[in-house]
Regions:
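Acidic, metal/ion-coordinating pockets
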Residues: 1-270
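A short C-terminal boundary segment appended to hydrolase-like catalytic domains
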Residues: 251-295
Length: 295
């Protein structure tokens, strides 16, 4: 769905998966090897959450839009362990293309019934610490991490998590040891803050300098320019799908990646909605009408 929001003091209609599909397709037409990722919190905030468990509409739409990967945000746990597990099982069984789900800091060392339910669903879906994707001859390691503040905002989450920085360090070390990659990108549902002590993704970049890019979620921060910490670029396109971030990187003489171009594309009514994507959205919406709104 689109949202009503205030931008520069003006009420505007923004966002919407059908418009985002148009933008992604245009970017992929320019460069078929475009990597498309998300920083988590993909599943709550509209009426579509009412069919979260039965339809897994958000993950299925992300797959249709062309997203390669995402991670978990705190709102993925809003329907508790049973709801999240059922949603993952539904998405996995749908037969649709769905994005990879990545998170490296779940602690499975102590199990109970709820955690086992989630572990089984994670395995069914194929949730991983990291994966390697090749785009245009560039091998990219993608990993996901769930931040400390995210956990504090997820009171219904039954999982335990390792320290985000330590888990990312361990995962990057594993990637360096086992994989031959050119770039490492972290999908972090941790966020940034004006308070340096609370800016989790800036602290992560300082602690793990091997990261080339951090896709920063959770704090709804709109970064008009990347935060550059050492050799790591931290980027965030804001909230509610009202922008799509676009970034082009180039490799320097030392083999590190530098931001050559970065911009936020506002998702507004002047962008034509993709018809096929809108038809899929309408079908999910019709199910919501029949199941909940017409009773």
């Amino acid at each position: 769905e689109t949202v009503r929001t205030v931008v520069d003091g003006e009420n505007v209609e923004a966002g919407g998966f059908a418009r985002i599909k148009t933008v992604i397709d245009e970017k992929k037409e320019e460069n078929p090897d475009t990597l498309v990722v998300d920083g988590g919190d993909f599943s709550m905030g509209t009426l579509f959450q009412t069919v979260y468990e039965e339809e897994a509409s958000e993950l299925r739409m992300l797959g249709y839009l062309g997203y390669d990967a995402t991670t978990f945000g705190n709102h993925e746990f809003d329907y508790r362990s049973k709801g999240l597990a059922q949603m993952l099982d539904t998405a996995a069984a749908s037969g649709d293309v769905v994005p990879s789900l990545l998170v490296c800091n779940v602690d499975w060392s102590e199990m109970n019934d709820e955690r086992q339910l989630l572990k089984d669903a994670f395995d069914h879906y194929g949730v991983k610490d990291y994966e390697v994707i090749e785009k245009g001859g560039v091998k990219i390691a993608l990993l996901g991490v769930f931040g400390k503040d995210s956990l504090s905002c997820a009171p219904t989450c039954a999982l335990e998590f390792k320290d985000p920085i330590e888990a990312v360090k361990e995962t990057v070390a594993t990637i360096k040891e086992k994989e031959d990659v050119d770039m490492i990108v972290c999908l972090s549902h941790s966020g940034t803050s004006e308070d340096p002590k609370k800016s989790e993704d800036e602290l992560l970049a300082k602690a793990v300098p091997e990261l080339d890019v951090i896709i920063s979620g959770h704090t709804h921060t709109t970064l008009e320019e990347p935060i550059i910490q050492g050799n790591t670029a931290i980027v965030s396109a804001g909230e509610y799908g009202i922008n799509v971030g676009s970034m082009h990187l180039s490799q320097n003489a030392e083999g590190r990646w530098e931001v050559e171009d970065y911009n936020l594309i506002p998702i507004r009514p002047d962008i034509e909605a993709d018809e096929a994507a809108q038809e899929k959205i309408d079908a999910f919406e019709a199910n919501i009408d029949d199941t909940y709104l017409k009773q």
